[in-house]
């Protein structure tokens, strides 16, 4: 039926209901959705009348009749509703088999846009945000019913987010989880886990009466000493000489402002106090969080939004934002964490901190060195924020370090040079992943080169870059020699540098790990030998697990139970332990990956996390989540929050969904790889 005929047919059928339409308030008020719903109701009434006289209405009326029922079925099966607005539009393009033509109807007039059908690209937030329950998990929520599906769907599946999250069979194994209490801890360290407790930030328009107060000089000296010894070496931001000069003036003349931006400097000082308080691991939990949060709230009030957005930028403003961002990183303020990092990066760029030579700018060599130091910290901060929050980091031009030998560089210059080179490799890794996840890249990809093959080609070159970086490290910087470094600050710097290097390796190999676990175990026929692509995929997954093992080993080396302050900040230790633990959970699905060595590394991660339970309530929740997920895979009794055991879980061979396991720790492998907008990985 043509569009014009359809319109006349509708008018003739509804003409008899003109009086009811005129009296309908929704129709008179111009509500399109309600009016469309009313029209469908009229069509259903006509449908019932026509059925009595054995007359048949056009096919689309029958679809309207079954709209809500079909939506319920599609929702239960986890598929996009075939009767949704977007799906109907697609059906008008593809002709069904066995029909010469299909009826093309004006969809907006027939299907009320009451609710959009679930998108295949992004799962509904309500589903992604809540852990699965026994009754809410379907038996099979990924059944390909499209007879014209792409033949290479399985091949590119792990590299294309449009196909949604990984699907798997849940079958009878889900019924055996009837007594399971779903994990309520979906938070991730340095993402949204409140490691520093609940931080309530006051409105910046409401100044705190104590915002300009300073602690007693003796206690302040103690906190300043802790910061320079145990916080600044990890990520240097401030110039020590300038900071100490202003610090002395603040206590010698506390009433007279030191400079025009006195409030800004007080904000820096209060964040320094807050980080130093959190660094003391032996202090009682509630006392530490309460005191540190009070210092941070003072700094927050002292830095109003107008000073960040509309006033000219300064190095002090960038430094204050970076310090604030470090603290916010360990709270549940994701939006403020992401925003402060972006502001610091943009303001630093506006000041040309990213340029090695700025002949038009006046300033001493010390100012230029400080700008380069701040810019290097900005890049490191942006990388940490973006990879942990699952956002795309800024692909900025990083100045090339001077081509000097290790003997010609000092210790600090060597650390900065290695850091800049590593950040540049990280830029290339992320760029390769972004290029592979865009539709534009797929359009210009050679016909015989799949998304998987293209990323594998890039990964080979990037792996060589990482290997060259590791080979360029002097012998006394190698991991095997780190324990022999006598200077505590230097040893901490080198440990953190190697942890970041291993993080880059995990970030590079994780797409292949995701692809490896998306493949069904029986996809390879028994009578055929594994292909080269399959072997490379398996080897890449093994290298990802090996990097996670090295992360766990390095973190355990830094543990010093007898020291009041650990070698590395305790929030970084929890962060990297969480990364390693998630990869070990993935290894449990494959016997060729979860070897005895990996099992020992898994146990070391659990022991290390138990040693951090006194530092944050989140650690106990993380432990319980890891133990529960491991029990689901291995079939051992899973624990409860009170320490008791629960029923038995089944092993991975019985059809437990891989994504169903990892959604409880907010870990979406598919979104992490190549999401349409963000990476979407909670762990990185």
UniProtKB/Swiss-Prot annotation:
SMART domains: Fungal_trans. It comes from the Eukaryota. Pfam families: Fungal_trans (PF04082). Disruption phenotype: Has low impact on expression of the sorbicillin biosynthesis gene cluster but, except for very low levels of dihydrosorbicillinol, impairs the production of sorbicillinoids. Keywords: DNA-binding, Nucleus, Transcription, Transcription regulation. One of its GO terms (cellular component) is nucleus. Residues 114-151 are annotated as: Disordered. One of its GO terms (biological process) is DNA-templated transcription. It is found in: Nucleus. GO terms for molecular function: DNA-binding transcription factor activity, RNA polymerase II-specific; RNA polymerase II cis-regulatory region sequence-specific DNA binding; zinc ion binding. The keyword ATP-binding does not apply. Transcription factor that acts in concert with sorR1 which is a transcriptional activator of the gene cluster that mediates the biosynthesis of sorbicillinoids, a diverse group of yellow secondary metabolites that restrict growth of competing pathogenic fungi but not of bacteria. This is Sorbicillinoid biosynthetic cluster transcription factor 2.
């Amino acid at each position: 039926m043509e569009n014009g005929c359809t319109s006349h047919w509708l008018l003739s059928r509804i003409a008899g209901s003109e009086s009811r339409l005129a009296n309908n308030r929704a129709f008179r008020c111009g509500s399109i959705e309600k009016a469309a719903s009313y029209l469908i109701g009229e069509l259903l009434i006509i449908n019932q009348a026509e059925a009595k006289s054995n007359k048949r209405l056009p096919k689309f009326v029958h679809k309207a009749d079954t709209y809500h029922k079909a939506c319920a079925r599609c929702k239960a099966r986890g598929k996009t509703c075939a009767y949704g607005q977007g799906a109907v539009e697609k059906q008008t393009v593809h002709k069904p088999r066995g029909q010469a033509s299909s009826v093309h109807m004006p969809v907006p007039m027939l299907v009320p846009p009451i609710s959009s059908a679930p998108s295949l690209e992004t799962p509904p937030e309500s589903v992604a945000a809540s852990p699965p329950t026994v009754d809410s998990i379907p038996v099979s929520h990924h059944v390909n019913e499209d007879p014209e599906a792409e033949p290479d769907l399985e091949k590119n599946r792990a590299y294309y987010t449009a196909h949604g999250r990984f699907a798997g069979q849940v079958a009878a194994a889900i019924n055996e989880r009837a007594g399971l209490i779903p994990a309520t801890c979906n938070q991730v360290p340095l993402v949204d886990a409140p490691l520093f407790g609940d931080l309530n930030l006051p409105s910046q328009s409401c100044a705190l009466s104590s915002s300009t107060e300073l602690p007693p000089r003796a206690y302040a000296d103690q906190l300043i000493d802790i910061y320079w010894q145990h916080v600044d070496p990890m990520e240097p931001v401030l110039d020590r000489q300038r900071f100490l000069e202003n610090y002395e003036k603040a206590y010698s003349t506390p009433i007279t402002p030191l400079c025009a931006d006195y409030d800004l400097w007080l904000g820096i000082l209060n964040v320094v106090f807050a980080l130093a308080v959190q660094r003391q691991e032996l202090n009682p939990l509630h006392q530490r969080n309460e005191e540190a949060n009070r210092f941070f709230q003072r700094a927050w009030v002292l830095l109003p939004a107008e000073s960040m957005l509309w006033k000219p930028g300064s190095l002090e403003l960038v430094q204050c934002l970076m310090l604030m961002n470090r603290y916010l990183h360990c709270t549940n303020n994701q939006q403020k964490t992401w925003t402060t990092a972006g502001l610091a990066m943009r303001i630093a760029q506006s000041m040309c901190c990213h340029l090695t030579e700025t002949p038009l700018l006046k300033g001493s060599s010390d100012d230029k060195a400080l700008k380069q130091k701040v810019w290097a910290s900005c890049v490191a901060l942006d990388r940490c924020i973006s990879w942990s929050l699952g956002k795309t980091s800024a692909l900025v031009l990083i100045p090339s370090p001077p081509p000097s030998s290790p003997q010609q560089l000092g210790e600090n210059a060597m650390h900065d040079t290695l850091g800049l080179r590593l950040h540049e490799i990280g830029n290339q890794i992320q760029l390769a992943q972004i290029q592979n996840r865009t539709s534009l890249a797929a359009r210009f990809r050679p016909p015989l080169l799949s998304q998987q093959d293209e990323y594998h080609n890039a990964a080979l070159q990037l792996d060589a870059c990482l290997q060259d970086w590791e080979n360029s490290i002097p012998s006394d910087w190698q991991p095997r020699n780190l324990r022999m470094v006598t200077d505590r600050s230097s040893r901490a710097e080198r440990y953190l540098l190697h942890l970041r290097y291993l993080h880059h390796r995990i970030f590079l190999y994780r797409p292949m790990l995701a692809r490896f676990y998306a493949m069904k175990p029986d996809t390879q026929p028994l009578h055929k030998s594994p292909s080269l692509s399959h072997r490379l995929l398996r080897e890449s997954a093994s290298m990802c697990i090996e990097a996670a093992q090295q992360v766990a080993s390095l973190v355990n080396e830094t543990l010093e139970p007898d020291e009041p302050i650990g070698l590395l900040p305790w929030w970084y230790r929890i962060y990297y332990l969480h990364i390693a633990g998630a990869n070990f959970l993935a290894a449990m699905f494959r016997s060729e990956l979860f070897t005895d060595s990996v099992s020992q590394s898994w146990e070391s991660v659990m022991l290390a996390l138990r040693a951090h339970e006194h530092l944050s309530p989140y650690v106990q929740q993380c432990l319980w989540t890891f133990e529960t997920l491991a029990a689901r895979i291995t079939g051992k009794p899973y624990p409860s929050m009170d320490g008791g055991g629960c029923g038995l879980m089944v092993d991975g061979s019985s059809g437990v969904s891989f994504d169903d396991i990892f959604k409880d720790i907010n870990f979406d492998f598919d979104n992490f790889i190549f999401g349409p907008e963000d990476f979407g990985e909670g762990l990185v």
